[in-house]
Amino acid sequence: MSTLLLIRSEIESLLDPMTLLAGLRQAFIDYSTSPATKAHRVRSQLPGLGTATVLFPGTTPGVPAYSVKVHAKFPGQSPAIRGVLCLHDVETGELLAVMDSTHLTAMRTGLAGALAADVLACTEADTVAVIGAGVQGRCQLRSFAALRRIHKASVYDVVPERAATFARELSSELGLAVEAAESAADAVRGAGVVFTATWAR
Protein backbone atom coordinates (compact mmCIF):
# COMPACT_ATOMS: atom_id res chain seq x y z
CA MET A 1 0.00 0.00 0.00
CA SER A 2 1.32 3.46 -0.89
CA THR A 3 1.56 6.27 1.65
CA LEU A 4 -0.82 9.20 1.19
CA LEU A 5 0.86 12.61 1.24
CA LEU A 6 -1.29 15.67 2.03
CA ILE A 7 0.17 19.16 1.78
CA ARG A 8 -1.17 22.18 3.69
CA SER A 9 -3.43 23.51 0.91
CA GLU A 10 -5.06 20.08 0.55
CA ILE A 11 -5.64 19.85 4.30
CA GLU A 12 -7.22 23.32 4.29
CA SER A 13 -9.57 22.44 1.43
CA LEU A 14 -10.57 19.04 2.82
CA LEU A 15 -11.29 19.90 6.46
CA ASP A 16 -14.89 20.81 7.32
CA PRO A 17 -15.10 22.60 10.70
CA MET A 18 -18.58 21.30 11.56
CA THR A 19 -17.58 17.69 10.86
CA LEU A 20 -14.46 18.23 12.94
CA LEU A 21 -16.50 19.71 15.80
CA ALA A 22 -18.71 16.63 15.96
CA GLY A 23 -15.72 14.28 15.78
CA LEU A 24 -13.72 16.18 18.40
CA ARG A 25 -16.69 16.33 20.77
CA GLN A 26 -17.08 12.55 20.49
CA ALA A 27 -13.33 12.02 20.95
CA PHE A 28 -13.41 13.97 24.23
CA ILE A 29 -16.39 11.90 25.40
CA ASP A 30 -14.64 8.65 24.43
CA TYR A 31 -11.44 9.75 26.17
CA SER A 32 -13.32 10.48 29.41
CA THR A 33 -15.32 7.25 29.47
CA SER A 34 -13.08 4.52 28.09
CA PRO A 35 -9.48 3.37 28.56
CA ALA A 36 -7.10 5.03 26.14
CA THR A 37 -3.45 4.68 25.31
CA LYS A 38 -1.55 7.21 27.38
CA ALA A 39 -0.26 9.96 25.14
CA HIS A 40 3.20 11.48 25.59
CA ARG A 41 4.61 14.89 24.75
CA VAL A 42 8.36 15.38 24.43
CA ARG A 43 9.56 18.97 24.07
CA SER A 44 13.08 20.28 23.54
CA GLN A 45 14.55 23.75 23.19
CA LEU A 46 16.35 24.29 19.89
CA PRO A 47 19.34 26.59 19.39
CA GLY A 48 17.89 30.09 19.21
CA LEU A 49 14.20 30.76 19.85
CA GLY A 50 12.64 27.58 18.48
CA THR A 51 11.31 24.50 20.24
CA ALA A 52 10.71 21.02 18.87
CA THR A 53 7.87 18.79 20.09
CA VAL A 54 6.84 15.19 19.48
CA LEU A 55 3.33 14.05 20.48
CA PHE A 56 2.51 10.32 20.39
CA PRO A 57 0.52 8.16 20.08
CA GLY A 58 -2.80 9.74 19.06
CA THR A 59 -5.52 7.09 19.22
CA THR A 60 -9.30 7.00 19.35
CA PRO A 61 -11.68 4.03 19.79
CA GLY A 62 -12.81 2.43 16.56
CA VAL A 63 -9.99 3.84 14.42
CA PRO A 64 -7.39 1.18 13.53
CA ALA A 65 -4.56 3.70 13.35
CA TYR A 66 -2.41 5.91 15.55
CA SER A 67 -0.71 9.23 14.91
CA VAL A 68 2.67 10.72 15.71
CA LYS A 69 2.98 14.50 15.40
CA VAL A 70 6.35 16.22 15.08
CA HIS A 71 6.41 19.99 15.00
CA ALA A 72 8.51 23.02 15.78
CA LYS A 73 7.48 26.39 17.16
CA PHE A 74 9.22 29.58 16.06
CA PRO A 75 7.27 32.55 17.52
CA GLY A 76 8.80 35.07 15.11
CA GLN A 77 7.73 33.22 11.98
CA SER A 78 4.41 32.96 10.14
CA PRO A 79 3.07 30.40 10.59
CA ALA A 80 4.77 30.00 13.96
CA ILE A 81 4.06 26.26 14.22
CA ARG A 82 5.11 23.91 11.43
CA GLY A 83 5.39 20.17 11.25
CA VAL A 84 3.97 16.87 10.08
CA LEU A 85 1.50 14.33 11.37
CA CYS A 86 2.21 10.69 10.51
CA LEU A 87 -0.64 8.17 10.54
CA HIS A 88 0.28 4.51 11.09
CA ASP A 89 -1.63 1.23 10.98
CA VAL A 90 -2.14 0.18 14.61
CA GLU A 91 -1.64 -3.52 13.83
CA THR A 92 1.38 -3.40 11.53
CA GLY A 93 2.91 0.05 12.05
CA GLU A 94 2.70 0.70 8.31
CA LEU A 95 2.88 4.40 7.42
CA LEU A 96 -0.54 5.24 5.98
CA ALA A 97 -0.27 9.00 5.55
CA VAL A 98 1.98 12.01 6.10
CA MET A 99 0.17 15.33 6.54
CA ASP A 100 1.26 18.91 7.05
CA SER A 101 0.25 19.62 10.65
CA THR A 102 0.08 23.43 10.63
CA HIS A 103 -3.62 23.78 9.78
CA LEU A 104 -4.54 20.58 11.63
CA THR A 105 -2.99 21.90 14.84
CA ALA A 106 -4.64 25.30 14.51
CA MET A 107 -8.06 23.77 13.84
CA ARG A 108 -7.83 21.22 16.63
CA THR A 109 -6.81 23.82 19.20
CA GLY A 110 -9.41 26.34 18.07
CA LEU A 111 -12.21 23.80 18.01
CA ALA A 112 -11.26 22.38 21.41
CA GLY A 113 -11.35 25.87 22.94
CA ALA A 114 -14.74 26.59 21.37
CA LEU A 115 -16.15 23.28 22.59
CA ALA A 116 -14.91 23.94 26.11
CA ALA A 117 -16.43 27.43 26.10
CA ASP A 118 -19.73 26.09 24.77
CA VAL A 119 -19.91 23.49 27.56
CA LEU A 120 -18.73 25.76 30.39
CA ALA A 121 -20.18 29.19 29.56
CA CYS A 122 -23.70 30.12 30.59
CA THR A 123 -26.26 29.72 27.82
CA GLU A 124 -26.89 33.48 27.68
CA ALA A 125 -23.24 34.32 26.94
CA ASP A 126 -23.30 35.95 23.51
CA THR A 127 -20.54 38.55 23.81
CA VAL A 128 -17.00 37.33 23.10
CA ALA A 129 -13.55 38.81 23.66
CA VAL A 130 -10.45 37.49 21.91
CA ILE A 131 -6.96 38.33 23.16
CA GLY A 132 -4.56 37.72 20.28
CA ALA A 133 -5.42 38.36 16.63
CA GLY A 134 -3.37 35.57 15.07
CA VAL A 135 -4.35 32.22 13.59
CA GLN A 136 -5.56 30.84 16.93
CA GLY A 137 -7.71 33.86 17.70
CA ARG A 138 -9.40 33.51 14.32
CA CYS A 139 -9.96 29.78 14.81
CA GLN A 140 -11.42 30.30 18.29
CA LEU A 141 -13.93 32.92 17.17
CA ARG A 142 -14.93 31.07 13.99
CA SER A 143 -15.41 27.82 15.89
CA PHE A 144 -17.44 29.39 18.69
CA ALA A 145 -19.61 31.22 16.15
CA ALA A 146 -20.38 27.83 14.59
CA LEU A 147 -21.64 26.59 17.97
CA ARG A 148 -23.40 29.66 19.35
CA ARG A 149 -25.20 32.74 18.12
CA ILE A 150 -22.86 35.63 18.96
CA HIS A 151 -24.19 39.15 19.40
CA LYS A 152 -20.83 40.92 19.23
CA ALA A 153 -17.11 40.36 19.69
CA SER A 154 -14.04 42.39 20.53
CA VAL A 155 -10.38 41.68 19.87
CA TYR A 156 -7.14 43.01 21.33
CA ASP A 157 -3.62 42.43 20.05
CA VAL A 158 -0.29 44.01 20.99
CA VAL A 159 -0.07 44.98 17.30
CA PRO A 160 -3.06 47.31 16.76
CA GLU A 161 -3.01 46.89 12.98
CA ARG A 162 -3.40 43.14 13.37
CA ALA A 163 -6.43 43.62 15.63
CA ALA A 164 -7.98 46.05 13.14
CA THR A 165 -7.50 43.60 10.27
CA PHE A 166 -8.94 40.78 12.39
CA ALA A 167 -12.01 42.88 13.26
CA ARG A 168 -12.63 43.93 9.66
CA GLU A 169 -12.20 40.47 8.15
CA LEU A 170 -14.08 38.49 10.81
CA SER A 171 -16.95 41.01 10.86
CA SER A 172 -17.42 40.45 7.14
CA GLU A 173 -16.90 36.69 7.26
CA LEU A 174 -19.16 35.96 10.24
CA GLY A 175 -21.72 38.70 9.75
CA LEU A 176 -21.39 40.12 13.25
CA ALA A 177 -19.98 43.21 14.91
CA VAL A 178 -16.29 42.68 15.77
CA GLU A 179 -14.47 45.66 17.27
CA ALA A 180 -10.74 46.20 17.76
CA ALA A 181 -10.15 47.22 21.39
CA GLU A 182 -7.40 49.56 22.57
CA SER A 183 -6.48 47.37 25.55
CA ALA A 184 -7.07 43.88 26.90
CA ALA A 185 -9.16 45.40 29.70
CA ASP A 186 -11.39 47.17 27.16
CA ALA A 187 -11.75 43.96 25.15
CA VAL A 188 -12.93 41.80 28.05
CA ARG A 189 -15.21 44.38 29.69
CA GLY A 190 -18.73 42.94 29.56
CA ALA A 191 -17.70 39.76 27.71
CA GLY A 192 -19.41 36.51 28.62
CA VAL A 193 -16.63 34.44 27.03
CA VAL A 194 -12.93 35.33 26.78
CA PHE A 195 -10.52 33.45 24.52
CA THR A 196 -6.80 33.97 25.16
CA ALA A 197 -4.92 33.12 21.99
CA THR A 198 -1.48 34.60 22.50
CA TRP A 199 2.01 33.73 23.73
CA ALA A 200 2.30 37.16 25.38
CA ARG A 201 2.82 37.15 29.15
List PLM regions with ranges.
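Short helix-loop-beta connector
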Residues: 120-127, 149
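NAD(P)-binding Rossmann-fold cofactor-contacting core
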Residues: 147-173
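N-terminal ligand-binding/catalytic initiation module
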Residues: 1-106, 114, 121-124
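Aromatic pocket-lining residues of Rossmann-like dinucleotide-binding sites
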Residues: 144
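N-terminal Rossmann-fold NAD(P) dinucleotide-binding loop
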Residues: 137-138
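Glycine-rich Rossmann-fold phosphate-binding loop(s) that bind the pyrophosphate
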Residues: 133-134
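Rossmann-like adenosine-cofactor binding region
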Residues: 175-201
